[in-house]
Amino acid sequence: MNEQYSALRSNVSMLGKVLGETIKDALGEHILERVETIRKLSKSSRAGNDANRQELLTTLQNLSNDELLPVARAFSQFLNLANTAEQYHSISPKGEAASNPEVIARTLRKLKNQPELSEDTIKKAVESLSLELVLTAHPTEITRRTLIHKMVEVNACLKQLDNKDIADYEHNQLMRRLRQLIAQSWHTDEIRKLRPSPVDEAKWGFAVVENSLWQGVPNYLRELNEQLEENLGYKLPVEFVPVRFTSWMGGDRDGNPNVTADITRHVLLLSRWKATDLFLKDIQVLVSELSMVEAPPELLALVGEEGAAEPYRYLMKNLRSRLMATQAWLEARLKGEELPKPEGLLTQNEELWEPLYACYQSLQACGMGIIANGDLLDTLRRVKCFGVPLVRIDIRQESTRHTEALGELTRYLGIGDYKSWSEADKQAFLIRELNSKRPLLPRNWQPSAETREVLDTCQVIAEAPQGSIAAYVISMAKTPSDVLAVHLLLKEAGIGFAMPVAPLFETLDDLNNANDVMTQLLNIDWYRGLIQGKQMVMIGYSDSAKDAGVMAASWAQYQAQDALIRTCEKAGIELTLFHGRGGSIGRGGAPAHAALLSQPPGSLKGGLRVTEQGEMIRFKYGLPEITVSSLSLYTGAILEANLLPPPEPKESWRRIMDELSVISCDVYRGYVRENKDFVPYLRSATPEQELGKLPLGSRPAKRRPTGGVESLRAIPWIFAWTQNRLMLPAWLGAGTALQKVVEDGKQSELEAMCRDWPFFSTRLGMLEMVFAKADLWLAEYYDQRLVDKALWPLGKELRNLQEEDIKVVLAIANDSHLMADLPWIAESIQLRNIYTDPLNVLQAELLHRSRQAEKEGQEPDPRVEQALMVTIAGIAAGMRNTG
């Protein structure tokens, strides 16, 4: 174990030294000495030296305004480098990869050892694998794209330096390159000056596809194929690609007025343009590689006399011409020019697939399988995974926007106000109109701008090539009419196919009613006819946790899924559950394997569809090798969950969860909603107000400009508490509820649940991880520096609660200390704390100075503002999960 860490530690310290030299060259010896002093004080403060802790506080409080930014940047950049070293460690032969035998191989061996599972059953489970990852542009990706590129290069240098056999001069060249990259990063502003537009966010998503997924997906399929051949003697069919990517960037308009129908249309075109760009590079390689002459009669018939000399090349050159014509047409459309569609415009995946597959089959038929299974196979798999759209997009809109639009329409038509009708009347009207042959929208009606926007979006969906839009997600869905309304609006736009429409249930009440809503929908004949046996439902993690606390929310999510699975099974409907998880615990984030195995039995039968958010995209898919390992983890977990489903919880366990849910929700809401001091405390003890100034995502941080916790989006709400290290949303209420159940004499039941029920043990594991990242002395320091004395008792009460919670969680899990079973994560947190602590102390100081200036009516000092932004970004890097 320790040898593994020593490789990581030596990389971290080497990068730290290079950063130190860079700082010295840029700003002089005295700044480097100041940074070094702070680092040493932080290290011994962590080791329990109280005198040094006090000195650390004093040193940071006494920094001059000129020293603030360099010190903040030094620690922030150091954390970015530490994260890069850790990311490399996870794929390095000396690091995690060494002790982490292939996940898929391990899973297959485990499955083969189960007497009740035949090899045939395992093969069938592999063939029904389906994994759809939905990339979302959450404002949590704090790091600028330009710095991400530099970190990818640093990673490449670490990989080459790991090679023992490199010559001295190569070693020196690599070290020089590292110094250049770290100097470039130091002299680059790490904070964006402007908020990204939705189109910028979409381009960020395409960059992930190009830099990592394009290579990562074929590599993952080769790895999967190798393991299946080795363990089951089974080869993957060429057309089998179980993984798809969808994006919310440019499609998610919920609470984001910047995402309009025009933006969505633009992003769809841009995505297709990027696909032609990437496929052209692939085809160029194939034109030069496929110089073979021998071909079966079928292929020769296809190419005719003209192509007989080099049939494969001939087909590839034709495909290249079509791609170029398509690209030119898309480029003109992006510039706003209207051109007639060219001959051979590519709009469907089959048009890409057919010539490539014809070459593949011919090469196989002529005994050239070794050539067929090279670059050509990778390109075929990319066609299946990415295809003409590159990434499909989801459209997401809030339910009330559809209700408002229909209300405006019915008032215009003089048939009443749809908004004020009962649910039964709404359904009757919608079903009548859905069955009607005549259009509902009057020709010369001039709707309001809001309604026009909703109708235009439906128009974009109807005009887009089928297959480029994956689903229409309705946020804050509460009733069957919410779903029917969208189907009606799409019908009016003239859509020619059945678009999957997924209700998103995201508050505690909505999760509890989800099954009832879906049962009513499935009882409508028209609806059953439309969906053709398939239904997608989205489960919201972040808003339910913000509404009711993490314990009550996770139980409501479990029960909603459980009930929906049963209802759909009974009705013969294939259910896809779409999980809206974030990177952080308060938004449902958990290590993939644990999270999937803790879902109700049967929840992955219809495949897995899950959001990948913000900075998690970079941690999980930032490099091709990491993509392979993330996709393999998901694959192993889905196979295991489907073939060895977790046990059904005992009735007594369900009753305990009901009890925990009620108690924890009461405690959580008692503070967050009912305690009059809570919102003022949140505003002063965390950088919640200041976060609004960070140019993070294209979406505003609040749903309404004024208002309390409920109007804050889930992401800034969690972000704020992560910054001051209290991590409140991820634990408040949970421990108190557990303590109460222990006092009622049920500790042994809780211990059994922890041992034998993955759902419950994952909950406790996630609490331990949060407690390991939280820090009570830092949270207390924020109070002392920033909070009105009248509110100190509330802060103290919350910190005492957390201390009690840690004790009860350790007692139930039978652990002597936090994260006992995951030493690697504990090590990683400790390693980063030394650099995150000074940023926290400095942030409290900066907030103090900036608020003081505001109170005295002075203009904010730009040095203080800039340093504050840097500490926010740095702590986010240190915590490895922001919102």
UniProtKB/Swiss-Prot annotation:
- GO terms for biological process? carbon fixation; oxaloacetate metabolic process; tricarboxylic acid cycle
Q: Which reaction does it catalyse?
A: oxaloacetate + phosphate = phosphoenolpyruvate + hydrogencarbonate
Which residues does the Swiss-Prot or TrEMBL record annotate as the active site? H138, K546
**Pfam families in alphabetical order:** PEPcase
Instruction: Locate the transmembrane regions by residue number.
Output: none
One Gene Ontology CC term in the entry: cytosol
Which cofactor names does the annotation list? Mg(2+)
Q: What is this protein called?
A: Phosphoenolpyruvate carboxylase
Source organism (scientific name): Shigella boydii serotype 4 (strain Sb227)
